[in-house]
Amino acid sequence: LGQAADRGADAVVDLADDQAIDAGLAAAAPGGYDLIVDFLWGGLAPHAINHANVGARYIQVGSSAGPTSTITAPAFRNKLLTLVGHGQAATPAEVRRSAYAQLMRHAIDGKLTLDLEHTRLDDISQTWERLKTGPPRKLVVTP
């Protein structure tokens, strides 16, 4: 959790137990959530839905916390939620190829800014230590 906060997260939620999850979600957005992008699913999804605003959109992307979840019908129905699944498998290969080509064009044209740090392999230990507390960036390691 400390690393997420150090890297710019607006809020972090302790997943130790149900009370901590609910308290963390409530503290992070006292007015509730209009959009939830869920990479975890599992037992955490019901907590997120409980803190969703009426009419919220719930985008289900991953299942790091488990492939199944138990959501009560009233919690889902009374919130008028829109549940959308999103995954690479649902995106046609041509769309992915086109998006990647556009990304590369932006990179070639200098429209992408990447925060890179170059380091030598011999210096990798010191670089890793510095990255633990410094700003996030992509690391390029050379011999």
State the predicted function of each range.
Residues 4, 36, 48, 83, ...:
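Terminal peptide-recognition signature
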Residues 54-61, 71-113:
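Rossmann-fold dehydrogenase core element
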Residues 94-143:
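C-terminal hydrophobic helical "lid"/dimerization subdomain
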Residues 41-43, 64-67:
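Short beta->alpha connector loops
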Residues 1-44, 95:
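Adenosine-nucleotide cofactor-binding segment
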Residues 50-52:
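Conserved helix-to-beta-strand junction in the class I
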Residues 1-5, 68-73:
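Short, glycine/polar-rich helix-capping loops at beta-to-alpha or helix-loop-helix junctions
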